[in-house]
Amino acid sequence: ARDGYIAKPHNCVYECFGAFSSYCNGVCTKNGAKSGYCQILGTYGNGCWCIALPDNVPIRIPGKCHR
């Protein structure tokens, strides 16, 4: 497991809009992470950051987000 921005297909982050929103924690835990939160103005803008996300779940990597 590792910490990181959980990625949608095509290397895009799950966008979020509030540091205290429960949205990211839900997205992260649903995918097997210990927890998650909305990182505001992070490397990829406002995106969900997951703690202890399983290795088989994709994380955002450098490069373009292909929508």
Swiss-Prot record:
Judging by the UniProt lineage, the source's domain of life is Eukaryota
- Which tissues is this chain's protein expressed in? Expressed by the venom gland.
Q: Where is the LCN-type CS-alpha/beta domain?
A: 2-66
Q: Which residues form the propeptide?
A: 67
Keyword Protein biosynthesis assigned: no
Cellular component GO terms, alphabetical:
extracellular region
**Which Gene Ontology BP terms does the record give?**
defense response
For this UniProt entry, the molecular function terms from Gene Ontology, in alphabetical order, are:
sodium channel inhibitor activity; toxin activity
User: Where can this protein be found?
Assistant: Secreted
Entry annotated with the keyword Disulfide bond? yes
Q: Which PROSITE patterns match?
A: LCN_CSAB
InterPro entries, per the entry? LCN-type_CS_alpha_beta_dom, Scorpion_toxin-like, Scorpion_toxin-like_sf, Scorpion_toxinL, Scorpion_toxinL/defensin
Q: Which family does it belong to?
A: Belongs to the long (4 C-C) scorpion toxin superfamily. Sodium channel inhibitor family. Alpha subfamily.
Q: What does this protein do?
A: Alpha toxins bind voltage-independently at site-3 of sodium channels (Nav) and inhibit the inactivation of the activated channels, thereby blocking neuronal transmission.
Specify the protein name.
Sodium channel neurotoxin MeuNaTxalpha-8
What is the originating organism of this protein? Mesobuthus eupeus (Lesser Asian scorpion)
Give the taxonomic lineage as stored in the record.
Answer: Eukaryota, Metazoa, Ecdysozoa, Arthropoda, Chelicerata
